[in-house]
Amino acid sequence: MSETATLPLRFTDSAASKVKNLIADEENPNLKLRVYITGGGCSGFQYGFTFDDKVNEDDFTIEKQGVALVVDPMSLQYLVGGSVDYSEGLEGSRFIVTNPNAKTTCGCGSSFSI
C-alpha cells in the first residue's frame, strides 16, 4: 500500500533529506521537525515549523530517512491529505505545505483559510 493511502499526511523525500541535514548541523539527533497551525496570517490560519526534541503522547509522527515529522492532533485535522515538502528555487528555499483542505491561500503560501 502506498504512503499516501496509509498516512493522513505525506512527508516527502526532499523534506526528510533537508530535516536530516539541519539536525546534523544542530548535532542533536533527538530533534524532530514539528509542523503546526496557529491562528493568524492574512487568511486566518498560518503554518509553523520548529525543531522539537519532545513528542507528546497524542502527536502524530511520520519517520523517513531516520528523521521524524511530528504534528499535534489539532493541527493534523487541518492537514489531512496534505504534504510537507522542501523546495529550493529562485524565491529561496523553504518548507512547503500543500493542503487540499485550504479554501484560499495567501500569496506567500504560509497562510490559508478553511
Swiss-Prot record:
What is the protein's known function?
Required for insertion of 4Fe-4S clusters for at least IspG.
Please indicate which superkingdom the organism of origin belongs to: Bacteria
The record ties this protein, via NCBIfam families, to: iron-sulfur cluster assembly accessory protein, PRK13623.1
* Family annotation (Pfam families): Fe-S_biosyn
* Keyword field: Iron, Iron-sulfur, Metal-binding
Q: Can you name this protein?
A: Iron-sulfur cluster insertion protein ErpA
Q: Which gene encodes it?
A: erpA
Q: Which BP terms does GO give this entry?
A: iron-sulfur cluster assembly
Q: Chaperone: is it a keyword of this entry? A: no
- Name the InterPro entries for this protein: FeS_biogenesis, FeS_cluster_insertion, FeS_cluster_insertion_CS, FeS_cluster_insertion_RrpA, HesB-like_dom_sf
Stored SUPFAM superfamilies: HesB-like domain
Q: What does the annotation say about its assembly with partners?
A: Homodimer.
Family as reported in the entry's similarity comment? Belongs to the HesB/IscA family.
Provide the taxonomic classification: Bacteria, Pseudomonadati, Pseudomonadota, Gammaproteobacteria, Enterobacterales
Which GO CC annotations does the UniProt entry carry? Answer: cytosol
The cofactor remark states: Binds 1 iron-sulfur cluster per subunit.
